[in-house]
């Protein structure tokens, strides 16, 4: 009887006092209605207990680092100061010093460079900024017939400055023809070998300077470039981590770099600025104990500005107007991120744990061009995924990791009874993205800043993994907006491809069976088939050795180059001398129209066809896409 009573006590103690039933046995006079009420009361007790036991789960984040910091940390943290005002004052002073040191380094890095050279720049001169992929000579026929549109650069001498990271990490993103070779996903440097160290003028100047040892790939630098006249060939070589391409044929212009140059203030201080801010952010969190909200906004502001001034500037020198123009809308994005995912999670993580939970992943995201620049994914286009080595594998690995993390976060949010609120917005987002894929002549571009925004709500669970993801995704947003602005999610396909080849573009077709040496091996005949894309294609442009030399009627179906070894002329065009002897001749064709009495190219150029003079044979065309 006693054990039965104890059992009843345990069971009934789970319910409120108002619902408890008498512990003594019922009298025989009790009615059946009372029995029914007692059973109903017990059922209500069980139901109430189950409901309480299965209430919404709340994660408890256990601190990874000790709750009580070391003695030296306790004695130096302003948290131990007697008033909140003292702590706020110390934080304000530290932030002010942090800002002033950054401004001094930024000024030194961008505004104090000078260069001098005895013969051309005897007095210190401020150099001209160049991007890593700038060149004098434009792609294909960008310099016009016989290169006349670029002739003003002859004998030009220029003092220039290159930024950091102009080595193998940057280069071509679309195919570029150099003689009989098609280069892509590599630096564009033609020549530089041999005694003269001359480069073809379509070479990227800064990467050529790295190849020549004039500037540093890591720190940048200054130099003096001098344009020269025609060169009869360019030797390829490998130096300073860059492999240059050889070109065994004449070209109308070339350039070289002068020696005996004196420079000051030309090194890019990007690493010093980054290390300073990494150290200051850690000190600020460890020693000054900011509130969660202050912690978030300091990270938001510092991470945004570190990109245009140090890690990945969008213009040279940094464009303050562009950076400030994007800063205000970026702050609205940060306000949304704080309210949607950061606030609840950050408040559950201790100040010491925030260093490794947030700061490390956040810096990894802010410096994505440095930490993940080796991943072969610049544009998620079908061409890049098919042609670029390792691109498809890298995308597969990233998609797998993303899917695992999304599933984990969805499970965490489901346990917190918050996943249902996100299901409808994400379903609507998926429908919108699918519809955008079908917009004609446009491509869906999910930039990495959009990935950071889209995935942030899934990282709002109260776990340390969520904190890691929040820091990394915030860094992604900052890197994307500060470098590329708020780029559109929908872009024209031609803009995405840039100067690449459009699929389905109609190009002329060589007729090599009808081509070759004629008239006693003195003249060279180049033939093509007469088919064209439409009636507009009334002309054919002929590039010889990567220079547009002739524009002739398509109906002729051939071009005869008289005495081509000594004087490259045609009966159909004005003379265009090329006084040199060579063993290989490279040809490419494109369709032109004659609109408004001016020739306009209406197709891409074919791949190169090589004619070997020694054995009178043809090779090609080499595919370019």
Predicted regions and their residues:
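Soluble extramembrane domains flanking the early transmembrane region of eukaryotic membrane proteins
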Residues: 2-273, 563, 569-586, 590-625
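Extended, intrinsically disordered cytoplasmic tails
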Residues: 485, 489-625
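Hydrophobic alpha-helical transmembrane segments corresponding to the first two to three helices
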Residues: 251-384, 391-399, 405-408
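Interhelical loop segments of eukaryotic multi-pass membrane proteins
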Residues: 109-132, 296-303, 316-322, 346-354, ...
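Juxtamembrane/interfacial segments around transmembrane helices
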Residues: 150, 328, 449-457, 472-485, ...
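Multi-pass membrane glycosyltransferase architecture that uses lipid-linked
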Residues: 283-284, 302-311, 466-498
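Generic detector of multi-pass transmembrane helix bundles and their immediately adjacent loops
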Residues: 342-485
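Terminal single-pass membrane anchor helices
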Residues: 80-87, 283-299, 319-320, 427-431, ...
């Amino acid at each position: 009887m006693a054990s039965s009573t104890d059992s009843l006590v345990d069971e009934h103690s789970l319910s409120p006092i108002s619902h408890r039933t008498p512990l003594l046995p019922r009298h025989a006079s009790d009615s059946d209605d009372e029995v029914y009420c007692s059973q109903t009361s017990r059922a209500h007790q069980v139901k109430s207990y189950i409901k309480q036991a299965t209430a919404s789960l709340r994660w408890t984040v256990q601190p990874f680092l000790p709750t009580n910091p070391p003695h030296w940390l306790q004695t130096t943290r302003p948290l131990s100061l007697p008033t909140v005002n003292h702590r706020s004052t110390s934080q304000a002073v530290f932030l002010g010093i942090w800002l002033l040191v950054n401004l001094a380094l930024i000024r030194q890095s961008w505004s104090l460079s000078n260069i001098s050279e005895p013969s051309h720049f005897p007095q210190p001169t401020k150099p001209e900024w160049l991007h890593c992929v700038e060149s004098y000579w434009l792609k294909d026929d960008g310099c016009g017939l016989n290169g006349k549109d670029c002739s003003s650069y002859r004998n030009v001498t220029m003092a220039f400055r290159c930024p950091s990271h102009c080595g193998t990490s940057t280069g071509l993103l679309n195919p570029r023809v150099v003689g009989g070779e098609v280069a892509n996903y590599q630096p564009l440097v033609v020549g530089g070998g041999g005694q003269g160290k001359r480069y073809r003028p379509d070479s990227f100047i800064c990467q050529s300077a790295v190849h020549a040892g004039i500037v540093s790939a890591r720190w940048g630098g200054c130099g003096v470039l001098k344009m020269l006249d025609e060169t009869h060939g360019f030797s390829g070589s490998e130096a300073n981590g860059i492999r240059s391409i050889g070109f065994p044929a004449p070209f109308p212009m070339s350039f070289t770099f002068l020696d005996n140059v004196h420079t000051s203030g030309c090194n890019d201080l990007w690493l010093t600025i980054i290390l300073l801010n990494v150290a200051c952010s850690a000190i600020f969190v460890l020693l000054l104990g900011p509130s969660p909200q202050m912690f978030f906004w300091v990270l938001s502001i510092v991470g945004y500005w570190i990109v245009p001034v140090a890690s990945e500037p969008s213009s040279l020198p940094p464009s303050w107007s562009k950076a400030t123009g994007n800063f205000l809308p970026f702050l609205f994005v940060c306000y949304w991120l704080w309210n949607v995912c950061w606030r609840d999670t950050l408040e559950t993580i201790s100040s010491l744990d925030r260093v490794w939970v947030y700061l490390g992943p956040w810096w990894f995201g802010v410096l994505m061009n440095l930490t993940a620049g080796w991943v072969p994914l610049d544009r998620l286009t079908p061409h890049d995924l098919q042609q670029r080595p390792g691109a498809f594998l890298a995308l597969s690995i990233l998609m797998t990791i993303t899917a695992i993390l999304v599933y984990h976060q969805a499970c965490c949010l489901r346990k917190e009874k918050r996943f249902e609120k996100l299901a409808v917005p994400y379903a609507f987002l998926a429908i919108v993205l699918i519809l955008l894929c079908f917009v004609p002549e446009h491509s869906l571009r999910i930039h990495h800043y959009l990935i950071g925004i889209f995935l942030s709500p899934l990282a709002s669970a109260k776990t340390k993994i969520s904190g890691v993801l929040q820091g990394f995704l915030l860094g992604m947003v900052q890197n994307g907006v500060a470098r590329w602005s708020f780029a559109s999610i929908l872009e024209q396909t031609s803009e995405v491809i840039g100067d690449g080849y459009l699929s389905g573009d109609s190009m002329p077709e060589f007729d090599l069976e009808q081509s070759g040496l004629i008239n006693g091996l003195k003249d060279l005949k180049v033939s093509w088939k007469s088919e064209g894309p439409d009636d507009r294609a009334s002309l054919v442009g002929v590039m010889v050795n990567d220079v547009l030399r002739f524009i002739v009627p398509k109906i002729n179906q051939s071009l005869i180059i008289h005495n081509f070894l000594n004087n490259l002329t045609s009966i159909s065009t004005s003379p265009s001398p090329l006084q040199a002897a060579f063993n290989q001749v490279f040809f490419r064709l494109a369709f032109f129209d004659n609109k408004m009495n001016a020739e306009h190219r209406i197709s891409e150029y074919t791949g190169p066809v090589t004619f070997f003079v020694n054995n009178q044979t043809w090779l090609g065309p080499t595919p370019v896409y």
